[in-house]
């Protein structure tokens, strides 16, 4: 159980909030974007408190003025400590998911305050016409009413910062809809360390287990951002091209959606759709046979393997397009993937078509052994003929993640290499490098922005601009839209 401290100052018959909720026992930095001015701070080393100096703002009831990015601090089953201006300490136990809120250690003093506040002449002389939003005549001197009042104040705060109805988040009949599940839509303090890096770096995975369990029941309606963990309505996400509107993170996009985004409607002609993988080396696996994994991936994605290839028109320009799908066994490159890409390049060479390959892969497929590794050389060989002999134009688009054998072969052979923002691009993963070299890999060194600065990429292009950029590049290289008379 995590324990955190925050302070209240009881004075002048009113309640003044003096200290924002600290992130943990080891972190006492103030929370940003609070409506209270921050004049001076006092650090109490005896009790590990981060105390605040004089404030000019007073509040008539217990409103927790923490910023929305620290809602995560109110985790289920959490104990906080409160102390008043007389240094009297109280423990407050929160279990928002199970609707528990308890006050201990000197409760009577806290109750006296609420009773005296309710009975003060300031409140008794107040007329209803004052329309004070903080006035609540329901406050009484009992533990039950005190708890309910603070509960309602906390709940009102959550509702003002989270725009998701709680009945979407729980199917329990006993779940109180007045409580918002506190882990949804919160933001990490390190989402945006710089303008060029929005990748979450400081999040305990165990804190998010319940989030994932909840969203699994509603995955046909909602999807959760991998970066800020906000819940996003699937239909709205598709309109945003799978870009999280909360943090700008680029979520993975299926190969079918990518084709729909890039190719003009009604012009897509798929190739080699009936080509499927077998188990050429009889790969042995204790967990799941290779053929079973292929079958389950086919049922999950509706694809025969991890790449779709074909021809179509991009703003009227005929192109050959191959799109890898990470949802199919991590986009791994086996014999079928290599063969389909090879045939696509050969067809583009014969028909003098510009070529686009969209990469999203974890590398060579280990279940096929050396057969998967030889695909690197096979694809590179036909690309050499396409680029060097025929002088045709190949654009490589790297999405997150692009690693392993794909990076080491056709991923980095494009005449123009384009990456999506914040894409993870590497040959070997961070963990492999650190275990092999016994050296730490600098944070962000394998991100697209870092590779662009090092000269390994030509451009980083957002999804909404990609089709227009490709059109201009093709026209620059003398590939123009078909005339209306030429379109069949």
From Swiss-Prot:
Q: Which top EC class applies here?
A: transferase
What InterPro entries does UniProt report for this protein, alphabetically?
Answer: AcCoA_carboxyl_beta (IPR034733), Acetyl_CoA_COase_Trfase_b_su (IPR000438), ClpP/crotonase-like_dom_sf (IPR029045), COA_CT_N (IPR011762)
Q: One GO CC annotation, please?
A: chloroplast stroma
Pfam families from the entry? Carboxyl_trans
> Domain CoA carboxyltransferase N-terminal: where?
221-488
E.C. numbers: 2.1.3.15
Q: Name where it mostly resides.
A: plastid
Where is it located? Plastid, Chloroplast stroma
Q: Which residues bind Zn(2+)?
A: 225, 228, 244, 247
Query: What are the start-end ranges of the zinc fingers (C4-type)?
Result: 225-247
Entry GO MF terms: acetyl-CoA carboxylase activity; ATP binding; carboxyl- or carbamoyltransferase activity; zinc ion binding
Gene Ontology BP term (one): malonyl-CoA biosynthetic process
- Keyword line: ATP-binding, Chloroplast, Fatty acid biosynthesis, Fatty acid metabolism, Lipid biosynthesis, Lipid metabolism, Metal-binding, Nucleotide-binding, Plastid, Transferase, Zinc, Zinc-finger
How the cofactor binds, per note?
Binds 1 zinc ion per subunit.
Asked whether the UniProt record includes tRNA processing among its keywords, one would answer: no
Q: Decide whether keyword Lipid metabolism is in the record.
A: yes
- Pathway, per Swiss-Prot/TrEMBL? Lipid metabolism; malonyl-CoA biosynthesis; malonyl-CoA from acetyl-CoA: step 1/1
Q: Which reaction does it catalyse?
A: N(6)-carboxybiotinyl-L-lysyl-[protein] + acetyl-CoA = N(6)-biotinyl-L-lysyl-[protein] + malonyl-CoA
Kindly give the HAMAP family that the UniProt entry links to this protein.
AcetylCoA_CT_beta
Its assembly, as annotated, is:
Acetyl-CoA carboxylase is a heterohexamer composed of biotin carboxyl carrier protein, biotin carboxylase and 2 subunits each of ACCase subunit alpha and ACCase plastid-coded subunit beta (accD).
| Record-stated family | Belongs to the AccD/PCCB family.
Q: What is this protein called?
A: Acetyl-coenzyme A carboxylase carboxyl transferase subunit beta, chloroplastic
